[in-house]
Amino acid sequence: EARQVSIRDILLAARLNLGNFDVDLPLSASVRAEISPEGIPQLVQGQVVADAGTIVDREYEKVSLNIDHADFRFNWDARRHSLIVPFQVQSGGNQFTMRATLDAPPEQDGVWLLGVTRGDSVIDPIIIAPGASSDDEGIAINRVAVRARIDTNRKRFEIEQGDLSRVDTRPSHNLGIAVTGSLDFAGAEPHAAFGVAGTRMPVSALKRLWPIFAAVDVRSWVEEHISGGMVERVVVAGNAPLEDFKHNGPPTPEDGLSVDIETSGTTLRPIASLPAIRDADLTVRITGRNAVVNLGRGTVEVSPGRKLSIAGGVFEVADTHPKPALARASFRIDGGVPAAAALLASDGLRDTVGITLDPASTRGTVAAQVAVKLAIARPMPEDASSYVINADLTSFSADKMLLGQKVEASTLKAVASSDGFQIKGDVKINGTPATIDLRKQKGEADAELHMQATIDEAARRRFGMDLGSTVTGAIPIKVVGRVGDNVSDDGMSVEADLTPVKIDNLLPGWVKPVGRPARATYTMLKTGKAVRFDDLSVDGSGATVRGSVEFDSANELVSANFPVFALSDGDKLTLKADRGTDGALRVAMRGDIYDGRNFVKSTLASTDKARQKQEDLDLDLKVGTVAGHNGETLRGLDLKLSRRGGRIRTFNMTSKIGRDTPLNGDLRVRARDNHQVIYFETDDAGALFRFTDMYPRMFGGQMWVAMDPPTQEQSPQVGTLFIRSFAVRGEPALERVVSGAPGAAGIAGVDFSEMRADFTRFPGKMAVRDGVVRGPLVGATVEGNIDYTRDDVHLRGTFVPFYGLNNMFGQIPIVGLFLGGGSKEGLVGITYEAVGPPGAPRITVNPVSAIAPGLLRKFIPSPGTFDPNFLPPTR
């Protein structure tokens, strides 16, 4: 009898070597024997008990068996030449309760017959504990029948019959396994030959019955990656030296191992971080070192109600001998884009892809070919697997996919791998055609977007960049930047080719026709609901602008800073703008030189009411020199304006024009109706008219003009113009009218004492009425229209030669009624019409009226009456 003796000590004392195995078990034993006088044991009975310990393969730590308790009882009967050993072994929840018999037939020298059967009528002989997965339920074998032959002379062990089965009231839980084989020690190396066949059984049962020492790495991979379903057929055969089946043994020859397994309804998870393939039909073929798993069909349920179909799958380990063994898999995926979007949003792909698509807002179908490479190892390192997915998307659409906009495509190509992904093709972004190339590399937080598109007026409105009539035409753009769920602060780099478009005061005073080269580059950043354009650079058509600008979610300007603001060659300006807490935009412009010609012209011609929103504004301009038309300049311009609620609250302007003549403006109240007006005055009206290119042939003149301020409603602006002591030079028609006056010969121009006219300004137009010009040699009446949009003047009236004498009759009430044309028209006059551009109108006269008295002339139509497009101003 012995108690708690280490098997290690027993083996060491007996000088026995178990090779690579280390047995660490505390052993207790008791033996009772009857010995014949000849010293031959007649009866031997006893018990061997092993308490908790381990049996470990020193060369491969994965082959490890924990023994909780083992109890062997034995009884040798020499007369019957029979050894009976009932035993029970408990290991990790598994339990083996059987009875082994060993008989030595007298007629067969050196032969022992081994039989293993059920050892207890109540306890199942083999009970296998559940696996780590919830799908791997435990299993019990209730029938065991093993017959084996040990031939010591031939050094051979043969399993003639090995039947393990379970008969259950549930047909799906019935199973049976048949084993035959031999182990031959006669040669230089032990040689094993075996065959295993199984009936239909659950996959979980096969996994639980798989011995821990057989194909350890493959067993570990199957344990983690395959579950559920049924094994329809299993046949395993081997015939090779025993060393070939060891973990560290030589490669298995091609005819040394054959495995044939067919399953249905199986769940396969090739990569642990991706959803499993369910309802799969698998066929496993292993020949020698080559293992191939074919998948006929299956589905991937990425989220409730969203599935992808899997077909044509192949999982192959070309050589199972290297450790770890390298495997590859390929299969085809078909399904809806919403399911694919849910897959991309899964934990295994979200960080790799970097872009999350809402499955609820995506549409289309996807067909993809997937290739996977992995190392069969346990534990599986994070970098032990890689994949490549080539996908074709059709009828694709996804809301807010790029730049917060909807993306649509009839076809789209996508390539994804464990190193990153790429999406490339022709799409529509919020309805705008574009070409995209979207890429993301492993380890990067966001994807990089390369996009080309042509943005027309409709597209700009859809993108919330409605520029009105300031930009007409389509703009080719190139966009490079980072997009994704973790968008960094790098922003989007945009390059816009402005050559094909017409620009009209996109920036104050910048006018560019179609075809003249210009480009803009900037970096667009979205911060919350605001959009900021940094590193803004505009070049072309004389413009050079550098700075930054920011807009809020309503496309309202928040701030702007342009340290370089040159809209024409030679401009030297800076501009800053910011919106205060009261919502008013504060704009400050400073500089030495500014070419104001385009600004003046476009301001007069503006008709875009949508662009003319009268927002709250504080304007502060200080410019050394403002260049105008016809060589005239404003110098020392200092202008301050404040507007609230669409109404101008304060206005003040000081400057000099001509030969240092002041040109000033402010707000005043008109006495007759107590109405606020904008008031300008200067002693050089001619210089101002030349500066604005309204009429370059006027010289001198003390002028004041009063007009209604602009309003939020774009109401017509009524005003009055008054000029005294001025001259008109270089006007041939006027000089012909006065050529007959005494002393008129050789004069350089025509002098006038005063001019007064009422006008009404509309967007892009002006209507003149009740205009009267008086002078010593000639007078005139003026009425008509000026269309700045079409650059067209259409004025008409009457020249009255010798105004002072000729109009004398008109001032006499009775005589003037019959002979005169009224208190402001002469007895004799010449009707005229001025048409053409404002800066150079063409004046024509009607000589017939020169000989007719005023009463008769009223029945002779002026030239303008015959113009079907002429619309007299409203009086």
Task: For each feature predicted by the language model, list its residue ranges.
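Glycine-/small-residue-rich active-site loops that bind phosphorylated ligands and cofactors
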Residues: 774
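A short, well-structured beta->alpha microelement
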Residues: 539-541
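Membrane-proximal interfacial segments on either side of biological membranes
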Residues: 1-83, 94-160, 169-534, 548-763, ...
